[in-house]
Amino acid sequence: MSYTSTDSDHNESPAADDNGSDCRSRWDGHALKKGPWSSAEDDILIDYVNKHGEGNWNAVQKHTSLFRCGKSCRLRWANHLRPNLKKGAFSQEEEQLIVELHAKMGNRWARMAAHLPGRTDNEIKNYWNTRIKRRQRAGLPLYPPEMHVEALEWSQEYAKSRVMGEDRRHQDFLQLGSCESNVFFDTLNFTDMVPGTFDLADMTAYKNMGNCASSPRYENFMTPTIPSSKRLWESELLYPGCSSTIKQEFSSPEQFRNTSPQTISKTCSFSVPCDVEHPLYGNRHSPVMIPDSHTPTDGIVPYSKPLYGAVKLELPSFQYSETTFDQWKKSSSPPHSDLLDPFDTYIQSPPPPTGGEESDLYSNFDTGLLDMLLLEAKIRNNSTKNNLYRSCASTIPSADLGQVTVSQTKSEEFDNSLKSFLVHSEMSTQNADETPPRQREKKRKPLLDITRPDVLLASSWLDHGLGIVKETGSMSDALAVLLGDDIGNDYMNMSVGASSGVGSCSWSNMPPVCQMTELP
């Protein structure tokens, strides 16, 4: 059976006139038809498939006069023109098979159609969608109870088979690329990678950790604040051997905060800068810092309070925001010696050495801040006072030595009267070679450091609260306590010599900070 298309037949088709401008042929420029198929077009397609077989649907228009695209010809043959195609409704066996296949495969209609000869994927899809709506309206389950369990088991097995197939393909790819596919991390210990509850990187107040802290180079070292993502590795590098012990001793941050510093120092084998007996300032013999300035001074000036968190570095300052001088005037008793305690260590320390030992002192105070300037001025003043004392000692008459005893007696009486007004600060024990015998026996009284530039502002509370600053021997006794008993006696001898009329020891030659009134 052959069919020859004529121009009259093509022109008589209304679909060709309407859709001719939308779809063009790729090789002869003729318009392709769209829409429903006619019986004549079905005969042309059947004759072509019988002669050439199925496949290469784009060649149908080339070998015949059928103006249809290849996709349209394929769908027309598969869904309507095949000789083994079944028409009509699905049988009960086919419906049962469709439910089982859908429970295993899902919406893979083409694969399901391969198991149903004579049925198309479109028919199976239409049947399933109709069945879903019908069972939903009736309130019935989509799958039978015994088939639903099988579907779940099959879906798990199918998912495993897919994963195994993908792994096999990846393994083949790795083997083609000369790579090792089987890589196991058996020796990797993930417990070491988990950060503990107690991190040494947070302890910024604990400096001079370990044995290396005794070196002068590391005396002013402070641990910086490190992000949590980097603390694990860097903390082990800074403090090896402490992480494992701390993780065993402390299970929570609350337990660490409630634990005394002595226990922590025994655990990690490093010195703790805080003492339980001095909660405000800490231990004054430990590596500490200036209050409110956070400047390390290697044990000379203590902390204002123990710190456990991050510390913001600031420049040193003697401006105390919490306590003002006006509040000192209003108080009935002298203020606590909190502001003066940091400078008691200067008084308790022996006179600064001269000569070659000054370089060691400068190395300990090598902070480049106000502490360096104060120490340098103090050393220079001591050297000037010693020179003046040598020049004045030779000219003091022997008859005036009795006045020295009188002045010493007045200074001792002033010390006794001062005890009832000033608050005594506890003095920690020191070594015998570092502290004179007299300083170990007598408790230290908080006195003003006249070398500081802001001492004049703080001296106003003595005028109103005590009323004893105007006494003649107050300044001499303060210098005696500040610079040591021996140097204080030197100043008293110099004052006696000046009252005797010695011209070579005039007070105008002294530095402004060391001038004092003459004793009567």
From Swiss-Prot:
The keyword Iron does not apply. It is found in: Nucleus. It comes from the Eukaryota. Residues 57-81, 109-132 bind DNA. One of its GO terms (molecular function) is sequence-specific DNA binding. Transcriptional activator of alpha-amylase expression that binds to 5'-CAACTGTC-3' motif in target gene promoter. Positive regulator of abscisic acid (ABA) responses leading to growth arrest during seed germination. In vegetative tissues, inhibits growth by reducing cell proliferation. Promotes the expression of aleurone-related genes (e.g. CP1, CP, GASA1, BXL1 and BXL2) in seeds. Together with MYB65 and MYB101, promotes the programmed cell death (PCD) the vacuolation of protein storage vacuoles (PSVs) in the aleurone layers during seed germination. InterPro entries: GAMYB-like (IPR016310), Homeodomain-like_sf (IPR009057), Myb_dom (IPR017930), SANT/Myb (IPR001005). The gene is MYB33. Residues 331-342 have a biased composition (Low complexity). Disruption phenotype: Hyposensitivity to abscisic acid (ABA). Reduced expression levels of aleurone-related genes (e.g. CP1, CP, GASA1, BXL1 and BXL2) in seeds. The triple mutant myb33 myb65 myb101 has a male sterility and exhibits slower protein storage vacuoles (PSVs) vacuolation rate in aleurone layers upon seed germination. The myb33 myb65 double mutant is defective in anther development, with a tapetum undergoing hypertrophy at the pollen mother cell stage, resulting in premeiotic abortion of pollen development and male sterility. It comes from Arabidopsis thaliana (Mouse-ear cress). Induction: Accumulates at the shoot apex upon the transition from short- to long-day photoperiods leading to flowering and after gibberellins (GAs) treatment. Repressed by microRNA159 (miR159a and miR159b) in vegetative tissues. Specific expression in floral organs and in the shoot apices is regulated via miR159-mediated degradation. Repressed in germinating seeds by miR159-mediated cleavage in an abscisic acid (ABA) and ABI3-dependent manner, probably to desensitize hormone signaling during seedling stress responses. Slightly induced by ethylene and cytokinins. One of its GO terms (biological process) is negative regulation of cell population proliferation. Residues 1-24, 331-359, 426-447 are annotated as: Disordered. It holds the Pfam family Myb_DNA-binding. Its main location: nucleus. This is Transcription factor MYB33.
